[in-house]
Amino acid sequence: MAENENHVLSIRMSHPYYSEKEISRILSTRDPKENNLRMQAFAWISTLSKTLKFPVRTSGLAMLLYSRFQLFFPVNEIPLLECATACLVVASKIEDTAKKFRDILLAHYLQKHPGSEVDAHSQVCYKLIEENKKRILGLERMTLELICFDFRVRHPHNYMVKFAKSLKFSSSTASIAWNVCTDAYKTYTMLKYPAHIVAVASISIACKLQQLPQPIIPRSFFAPPALTEAVIADILDLYMHYQPHTCIGNMYTTEKLLGLCVDFQRAQKNSGRPQKPPQIDPHSSSLADEYRESNKRLQESKESCARFILDCDRKYFNTEFEKRMLEERRNKGTV
């Protein structure tokens, strides 16, 4: 190994999805009040996106990035609004809808301080923007590292439109399903299941809301009933606890949504499928604990670095990592 070559201390592979057990393990150690703060962050992203005229796919991806960020970093460790804005910055670049960074910072300041009259070209405005610039840039870097610079994204809306056309749904039903897809970004379901499963679940919920018979889902949709029902459960849970923060919640009464949830739970019990919650070992470390420990080791080692890889390169770099760790232990005389 060359003397000036940085040692790869950590190899991080992109994980587009996490299991129900992995997410539950992280959330079991968190304050339930964090969910309310997460909804505040989503409201901030939605309002800022409307101000900057971002499309739904950009604001939705920003919410998805924020949910991932909050899994690995508790709310009390990060500035809420600045983190939400940083996620929106990353999402705008991934979706190729980027705005000038200065315009985003200015919109961030004006939204944080409503009613303030600041000239966008004044020296005062420049100083106010610079105060948040470094902080948001730092959070942007953390977000990029958290997703391992993996910019592959699939949105449920695209699948939903294709499925709705295939099933010959009316425009009103498709419109409701579209809003359900948008609400799905405010849950963890987008981190657990592929976008096409979320699309099928959204169509099912839209049919229930309009009291239409459930469509027969073709096998070509590749949407197993068990996965679809798991997504439906997550979205209905959002409507039960955070109705005012959702698109559908503003279209239907609480009684309507509550009845929908009760009917779904009753159908789940009668289906005969086991409804066992994931078994969580309280003594095992979570993904968030391991990630923070890895960051700590990198900060303590001045000459080490992390390597970010996609799934196709995992085998090669895992072998390389094992060789380097063995070499390090030999140099220290521990082998």
From Swiss-Prot:
One of its GO terms (molecular function) is cyclin-dependent protein serine/threonine kinase activator activity. Residues 269-293 are annotated as: Disordered. The gene is lsc1. This is CTD kinase subunit beta. CTDK-I consists of three subunits, ctk1/lsk1, ctk2/lsc1 and ctk3 (also called alpha, beta and gamma). Interacts with ctk1/lsk1. This interaction is dependent on ctk1/lsk1 kinase activity. Belongs to the cyclin family. Keywords: Cyclin, Cytoplasm, mRNA processing, Nucleus, Repeat, Transcription. The lineage of its organism: Eukaryota, Fungi, Dikarya, Ascomycota, Taphrinomycotina. Gene3D superfamilies: Cyclin-like. It comes from Schizosaccharomyces pombe (strain 972 / ATCC 24843) (Fission yeast).
